[in-house]
Amino acid sequence: MNQKQEDFSPSVKASLKSLNISFHKTRKVVNQIRGCSYEKALMILEFMPYRACKPITQLISSAASNANHNLGLKKKNLFISEAKVDEGTTIKRFQPRAQGRAYSIHKPTCHITIGMKSKNKIQ
């Protein structure tokens, strides 16, 4: 019988809801760090010139601190196992124009979820 080996390494997640940045722009940044170690992801984000880098850096630091505090995992052993960006609600505003008209402005938001696991497996 073929049985799948289950992954028993502990994992931790952190999420950020309703970030006022387009999910297209945020997804471009998150795709660069998926699968990286904690330290490498922070280094990559530090040198990228995008506005989404700062909240993603804070979210990764929060997930690593959660893993350290709640599960006792060391930050140097963590890697990003899951990183996803979903489309949030669109905030609608109106821009006044000439002769009583109004143009609609759509301000997109996104939801970011970061999952981290330890490289060391628990048997």
Curated annotation (Swiss-Prot):
Pfam families: Ribosomal_L22. SUPFAM superfamilies: Ribosomal protein L22. GO terms for cellular component: chloroplast; large ribosomal subunit. PROSITE patterns: RIBOSOMAL_L22. It is found in: Plastid, Chloroplast. Its main location: plastid. The keyword Ribosomal protein applies. It comes from the Eukaryota. Part of the 50S ribosomal subunit. This protein binds specifically to 23S rRNA. The globular domain of the protein is located near the polypeptide exit tunnel on the outside of the subunit, while an extended beta-hairpin is found that lines the wall of the exit tunnel in the center of the 70S ribosome. HAMAP family: Ribosomal_uL22_B (MF_01331_B). This is Large ribosomal subunit protein uL22c. It comes from Chara vulgaris.
